[in-house]
């Protein structure tokens, strides 16, 4: 297991520097977050551009910075990747049950399980290298079983990909466990 810290959760440069020196990778959602992560000296292979909706300039920027790991959840995104970062290593983001979380993401991010096979087929036809599966149970998830359900869904995607000759090497598990609030720090 290799941690990839979501910069959006706390972009303090000192925290990022320490995490980088401890060997953490970084989950980036924007050009600015890529720049911030790279300023820590982290190797580019430890950067994931995890925003599933990227514009042309963002994809070109990622490519110019050798940031190759990208997420996608639609054919529109695959089409942009094919045009502007064709050598990317792509990670399909799936919707999972986030009903136990305070901050939900699945209404706006991730493809449904019914869309997985078609998206993987289109990626294969377009010669887009799919190397992983991503999901996010939402922030502050209070139902541990949601993680098990998400892992089960990821396994289904893994099996579909395997049948298609796609080698999945990465599973990006998103979401956070709630901590305790014992007062001010």
Q: Which residues does each PLM region occupy?
A:
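A conserved active-site cap/scaffold subdomain adjacent to cofactor or substrate pockets
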Residues: 175-179, 184
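Active-site-proximal beta-alpha core segment in soluble small-molecule metabolic enzymes
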Residues: 2-170, 179
